[in-house]
A protein has these predicted regions:
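Membrane-interface helix-loop junction between the first two transmembrane segments
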Residues: 43-61
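Juxtamembrane helix-capping/reentrant segments at transmembrane boundaries
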Residues: 59-73, 127-138
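Short juxtamembrane and helix-loop transition motifs at transmembrane-helix boundaries
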Residues: 61-70, 125, 201-209, 266-274, ...
Length: 422
């Protein structure tokens, strides 16, 4: 909104109004404003949650030895993150930009889904919250909206990066002059770092391109669901999900920035995406909101984000990566979320396999995997065998959190470095 106001004022030479025409200025303003909202208004909102007794009431002491200190801590703090993202974007973003619109829809949609889950847990006293099938339906819904919009909107185009060999043998990356709609995505080790989903259905001949888009929509739904649930599982320790997501957000912001500048896109040998510069403003608000929230969520937490926050930030990361055609980098960049998901899935499969044989067995002491590192073998039910019993020494949750942050930083660096490997 302010963007349009200052654009109008600039016509009358209003001092400083021209600054709002620069993406860099609006991005800086977005991160500052989001940080202020989440840190200053966040404190007031936490006090409101305390007065309304919207707090944690149940903690499994067998999993969390520090759980007694967490009972009574306000939950649903994800509302702070959501408002700290939405307000700067609505004020500073171009609201006619299709990418900004999709990110705002994702934030509101998944925020509402997570809010419903937390509401049922806290106010209806149902620890299971929203039924799993309704969560999946909500996640599939946003994935379907994003996938179909990217397919149907004429604003969604790319300029393909092409490698040209010079007479001296050097490789130069240039971008095609024509903007096209394509099912291409960025992936390391492939020619020009591009992979076309349509290539997987090439046997369909003249219908391959349409089939490629259908495949893209299906992959979009899968990625949104997987990453959203991964972030939800990762939110099990003070500061864990907020810190990891901020690091991932910063990496995606760098990729969006270079994708929106044809020269930088050429340097990293990735496609140029016109209009994606508005995504930098969104991700700056996202990072600012998470850092401000982390002020209160770091150990010992004064507030928890709840599913209101975790489902939302996971979905935001997924949709953002899809929009900038970097969804196939998610297994590397969001490796922590992937491992959290896999640990839960493998644990359940292994446990059920043993149950059919009449044997109590587990792969890990506890899942998601971060709980494995703080669970003593003495807490495992008698007669249950565990495959991975190490480490014998238990770690404090703050140490586990910081080490997971470090792993995410390393994965973020690897994600960008792989784009330069040819």
């Amino acid at each position: 909104m302010l963007y349009y106001l200052f654009q109008w004022l600039d016509k009358y030479d209003f001092p400083g109004a021209g600054m709002f025409g620069y993406t860099s200025f609006r991005s800086l303003m977005a991160i500052i404003l989001a940080l202020l909202i989440s840190s200053i208004w966040g404190d007031k909102f936490i006090n409101l949650l305390k007065r309304k007794q919207i707090t944690e009431t149940q903690r499994d002491a067998s999993i969390d030895p520090f759980g007694v200190n967490k009972v009574g801590v306000p939950s649903m703090g994800g509302v702070i993150i959501i408002f700290a993202i939405l307000i700067p974007c609505l004020l500073l973003g171009k609201l006619n930009n299709i990418y900004m619109i999709l990110m705002l829809i994702t934030t509101i949609w998944l925020g509402s889904l997570g809010f419903a889950d937390d509401y049922i847990k806290i106010f209806k006293k149902d620890k299971e919250g929203l039924h799993g099938k309704f969560k999946i339906i909500g996640q599939v819904g946003v994935g379907l909206i994003v996938g179909l919009t990217l397919y149907l909107s004429p604003q969604v185009v790319i300029r393909e990066n092409i490698e040209i060999e010079k007479p001296d043998g050097q490789i130069e990356v240039v971008h095609a002059a024509k903007e096209i709609k394509a099912t291409q995505t960025t992936i390391p080790f492939f020619k020009s770092n591009n992979f076309d989903y349509a290539a997987l259905v090439g046997f369909m001949g003249e219908h391959a391109q349409t089939a490629g888009w259908i495949l893209f929509v299906i992959i979009t739904i899968f990625v949104v669901t997987a990453v959203s649930n991964g972030a939800n599982l990762n939110d099990g320790m003070d500061g864990m999900a907020a810190g990891n997501s901020a690091i991932i957000g910063l990496t995606l912001g760098i990729l969006a920035y270079v994708s929106s500048h044809i020269e930088y896109a050429g340097y990293l040998n990735i496609m140029y995406i016109p209009g994606s510069e508005e995504l930098v403003i969104f991700i700056c608000a996202f990072i600012g909101a998470l850092i401000g929230f982390l002020w209160y969520n770091a150990y010992p937490a004064q507030v928890f984000m709840g599913d209101t926050g975790s489902l939302t930030i996971g979905g935001i990361i997924a949709v953002y990566a899809i929009i900038i055609h970097k969804e196939l980098l998610i297994p590397i960049l969001c490796g922590i979320f992937l491992v959290e998901n896999l640990s839960v899935i493998l644990q359940r499969l292994y446990y059920k396999a043993g149950k059919r044989k009449g044997v109590k067995q587990r792969l890990f002491k506890r899942t998601p995997i971060h709980d494995h590192f703080r669970t003593s073998m003495s807490l495992i039910e008698p007669g249950c065998s565990v495959v991975f019993t190490k480490p014998d020494k238990l770690f404090h949750e703050s140490k586990i959190t910081i080490r997971f942050w470090i792993v995410t930083i390393v994965l973020a660096a690897i994600t960008i470095i792989t784009l330069k490997i040819r």
